Design a protein with these regions (language model features):
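Active-site-proximal segments of metal-dependent phosphoesterases and phosphodiesterases across multiple
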Residues: 127-147, 155-207, 211
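Non-catalytic terminal accessory segments
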Residues: 15, 176-178, 257-387
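Active-site environment of divalent metal-dependent phosphoester hydrolases
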Residues: 27-30, 58-69, 129-131, 167-174, ...
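Extended active-site neighborhood of metal-dependent phosphoesterases/phosphodiesterases
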Residues: 37-152, 228
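Divalent metal-coordination and catalytic microenvironments
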Residues: 3, 25, 61, 123, ...
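Conserved beta-sheet core of the metallophosphoesterase superfamily
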Residues: 55, 179-274
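Loop/turn elements at helix/coil->beta-strand transitions in domains of secreted/extracellular proteins
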Residues: 15-19, 51-56, 116-119, 156-162, ...
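N-terminal active-site segment of His-dependent metallophosphoesterases
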Residues: 1-37
């Protein structure tokens, strides 16, 4: 019922959008293998009926495998079934002629968008997560192969670019703030691939990067101190399983591929309503430089933060508070563990760094030493008592 009402709300707001972007996690956590493909196909069919002229962009998420989270192997049956269902929507009017050939391999494709000179590079970056494992097939060298594929496309694709994927680079704010309580800085991607990826985007004129995964509305800025900061939009989820209100975004696209008038539509009190957008934060054009300015204003002006928190959780009570605010603010521009730690001026280590491994090893050695000492003490005590 929630899904149907969301589709109807999208149609009401824009009956004939040129582009519809779906940033992954079509499926629920722990969905059965039996239901995975029919669900992904049914979503494509429903959206096709709702928007028969729109060009679709689909990036797969960590749930989208049919055999568990972070588990999709290349050339899987799931990929072939999704390609068959979504291909007519994505390759509308020949916009993505190589889609069927490349998507069935690892979720990658490129597309021409209906703005002059604008192209999209779409890929499955779940392979780059430290949690990735091929549970329903052979992973092979998919991590390196997919990364090389994206880098080649960045070099070869002309004009203004959108890059679309599911997992954002940088820090997992929810896990860092609420699960580990700052004791561990949790990364979304393998640090080596994260650094390589963000460097690649910094070297190319990227009009927009789009990610999902967090279920919340937010932004990131790659290379915020460089001459061409890259704006990244994090899209919210229709599913409310992380305490968010169900939500989706609408935006206008300019001639250079940047966004304007990004608005959040949220399901509140039984109806879908516009709860505002980036203009409530003083941002009209969603560009790298505008986001750098917004980042500075949010850091200096605490009275602006409630507006961001409202958008972040689509109008639901926010997980962000005065104490953990630095985690969410710093994550927008500080992607590595050391820059993030310096920004928050707090402790914490990452398990995926040398320091993290050394810390874990140190804790394990201490535990082992205590266990050995207690065991020896108990043995001596038993001998003294003649047991």
């Amino acid at each position: 019922m929630l899904w149907e009402s969301a589709v109807h709300a999208m149609q009401r707001i824009d009956p004939d959008p040129p582009v519809v972007v779906v940033n992954g996690d079509l499926l629920a956590h722990s969905i059965s293998r039996r239901d995975a493909i029919p669900t992904a196909v049914a979503i494509a069919q429903r959206l096709d009926r709702a928007f028969p002229h729109a060009q679709f962009i689909l990036a797969l998420g960590n749930n989208d495998s049919g055999c568990g989270d972070y588990a999709l192997a290349p050339d899987a049956t799931f990929l072939r079934a999704v390609a068959a269902a979504w291909g007519p929507l994505i390759n509308r009017r020949g916009a993505a002629p190589g889609f069927m050939r490349t998507f069935v391999r690892d979720g990658f494709y490129t597309a021409t968008l209906p703005v002059a000179g604008l192209h999209a590079i779409v890929f499955d970056d779940v392979y780059w997560s430290p949690r990735y494992h091929a549970a329903c097939g052979k992973g092979g060298n998919v991590v390196n192969a997919s990364f090389t594929e994206v880098e080649s496309a960045l070099r070869a694709t002309p004009g203004h670019l959108w890059v679309l994927f599911h997992i954002p680079p940088g820090v997992d704010t929810f896990s860092t703030a609420l699960i580990s309580k700052r004791t561990v800085i949790v990364p979304f991607m393998r640090p080596d691939l994260r650094d390589r990826f963000t460097a690649d985007l910094s070297d190319k004129h990227i009009a927009l990067a789009v990610a999902g995964h967090t279920h919340k509305f937010a932004y990131r800025v790659i290379d915020a101190t460089g001459p061409n900061p890259v704006p990244m939009l994090l899209v919210p989820a229709i599913s409310p399983i992380f305490g968010n209100k169900p939500a989706f975004l609408t935006a206008d696209v300019t001639g250079d591929g940047s966004l304007r008038h990004v608005e959040v539509t949220s399901f509140k009190r039984g109806r879908w309503i516009d709860i505002g957008g980036m203009r409530s934060l003083g941002v009209d054009a969603f560009t790298g430089k505008a986001l750098v300015d917004l980042q500075a204003r949010l850091g200096a002006n605490p009275s602006l933060r409630p507006a961001f928190e409202r958008l972040y959780n689509a109008g639901a009570p926010s997980e962000i508070n005065e104490r953990n605010w630095p985690i969410y603010w710093c994550a927008a521009t500080a992607f590595g563990t050391t820059p993030f730690r310096n920004c928050t001026q707090a402790g914490g280590f990452s398990f995926i760094t040398q320091r993290g491994l050394e810390a874990v090893a140190g804790v394990l050695l201490i535990v082992v030493a205590i266990v050995v000492a207690v065991d020896r003490w108990q043995r001596r005590r038993r001998r003294r008592l003649g047991l």
